[in-house]
Every structure is written in C-alpha cells, then in structure tokens.
C-alpha cells in the first residue's frame, strides 16, 4: 500500500516511479517479528555488539544475505535505492536532505500508519469513535463519509473512515507538493540535498495529523493491553535469542558459515529478524518447549 500511494503521488509530481517503488518495497524489509517491539527487544539483546536497526538490517538483506547471482552477493540494486535505504528522512535539519523519492516514501508510510493504526484501535476496541471524533482530522473525515453515505453500519463506517483518511492525506500532499516543486524548480538531486526542503503535508493538515498521532500515542500505543502484549512478545524474542547464542547448532546448517563470519550473537539477531511472526512462534514453541497462549 505504501508503494501504491507513493507511486500515485510520484507520478503526478513527475518523480522516478521505479525508484519510488523499489524504496517502498525495501522500506520495512528489515523489520523483525512483532515490528518495533521486536526491534527494541533485539537491540537490547545485542547492545554489546552495536544493537539492532531494522533499517541497517534491510541493507544487509539486499546487499549480503539474498543471493541471486553467481558472481556476487545481494540483489544488485542501484546506488539510489541503497542510498535511500541508508539515508532515511532526518527532520532535525542537519545534514543533506535525501532524494525527493525517499522523502515521498516516508510521507506515504506516515499516511498509512495513521490510517491503519486508527482502524486497528477501533477494531480492537482500544478506543471508540466518540473519542476519536474530538480530533479535527477524524471529525473532518467522518463529516465527509456521513454526507456521502448516510446510514452505514459501524463496520462499514469505520472502513469508509480509513479510506477517507488516506484519500484526504494523498490529495493534500499532491496539492502541497505540486506547489512547492513549482516554486523551487529543482534542477538536480544535489539541489534537493542542499536545500531545507522536506515533503510534508500542508500546515493545516500537518497540525491535525500531529493531534491524531499524539492521541494514538497516549491512548493506543500506551494502552495497558498493548503494553502487556508487547512485553510478552519481547520476552519471547529475548528467550529465543539466548537459546541460539547458547547453542549455535540450533541454526540451520546453511547459516553456519555466516555465523562463523559475523559472530554467533549477530547471527542470532539476524536469523530471528528474518522470521515472520508465524514462523517465529512455531520456532519458539519447538525450541523452548513453551506454548504461546492464543
């Protein structure tokens, strides 16, 4: 979805669509099981060897781990893709700006997170719609939904809200970005890097996004139910990591050469980070003998 949204905006702005798609597909490729909770757990486990970063691991995957050619490791991606993965958007204002395509993927990622985290919060009943309607962005979206589709049941109204949240952000960014690029008239990527420019929503929508994100942080991400789930997930990752470090024979045989090359501790982190949630849980139960409660 991030790739689709970013390409749509990039096409209208006449940016490099192929680069946008490659960057979007690489964007979260390095995430371990359980997303950011898993990343924090692995980083804590690996603190003595430099920690763990899903961005850096994403680079490791496409440059070293994936083997598609007989003459060299990695996927043979272009310098622009690799640079985009390495140089994510830093809004501190220091250092050169990343390419516009990198910035656009970051903006599209923010859009989808806001929309789907709102959706998940409602589906899990962590918050209710009455609470969300106090927020300007949600109130704006629901007003539109109700004007177009009167009498929707709660489930369909929620889905329509999510669609409108995405649509509103896309239209806003298309308008804002188009005007900004017309004013700036960048001639090269070096012009972008040397500027103070960042792809961001309009000031009005940006303020409403920040209000929504603050609400989600306080009332969803810090919800006691999610904190408990996060803690359990992190404990499982730490337990399985310790098992692999203590007994490297648990690694599949084909991973042993890399384990000898980069060290057992780093290999344990990489191997776990490459798992899906489902495969991790199956592996955890098999190796530890502990059943994960549904």
Residues covered by each model-derived region:
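Aspartate-rich (DDxxD/NDxxD/DxxxD) Mg2+/diphosphate-binding motifs
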Residues: 19-48, 55
């Amino acid at each position: 979805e991030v790739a689709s949204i970013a390409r749509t905006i990039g096409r209208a702005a006449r940016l490099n669509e192929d680069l946008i798609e490659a960057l979007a597909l690489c964007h979260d490729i390095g995430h371990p099981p359980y997303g950011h909770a898993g990343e924090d757990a692995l980083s804590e486990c690996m603190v003595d060897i430099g920690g763990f970063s899903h961005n850096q691991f994403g680079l490791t995957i496409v440059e070293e781990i994936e083997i598609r050619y007989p003459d060299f490791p990695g996927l043979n991606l272009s310098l622009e893709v690799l640079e985009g993965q390495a140089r994510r958007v830093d809004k501190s204002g220091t250092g050169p700006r990343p390419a516009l395509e990198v910035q656009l993927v970051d903006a599209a990622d923010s859009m989808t997170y806001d929309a789907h985290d709102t959706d998940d919060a409602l589906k899990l009943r962590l918050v209710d719609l009455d609470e969300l309607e106090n927020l300007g962005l949600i109130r704006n979206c629901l007003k539109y939904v109700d004007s177009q589709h009167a009498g929707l049941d709660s489930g369909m109204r929620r889905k329509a809200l999510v669609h409108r949240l995405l649509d509103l952000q896309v239209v806003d960014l298309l308008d804002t970005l188009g005007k900004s690029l017309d004013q700036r008239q960048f001639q090269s990527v070096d012009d972008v890097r040397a500027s103070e420019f960042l792809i961001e929503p309009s000031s009005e929508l940006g303020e409403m996004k920040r209000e929504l994100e603050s609400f989600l942080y306080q009332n969803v991400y810090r919800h006691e139910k999610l904190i408990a789930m996060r803690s359990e997930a992190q404990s499982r990752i730490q337990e399985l990591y310790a098992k692999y470090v203590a007994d490297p024979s648990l690694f599949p045989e084909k991973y042993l050469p890399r384990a000898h090359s980069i060290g057992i501790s780093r290999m344990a982190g990489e191997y776990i980070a490459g798992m899906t949630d489902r495969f991790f849980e199956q592996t955890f139960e098999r190796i530890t003998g502990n059943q994960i409660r549904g």
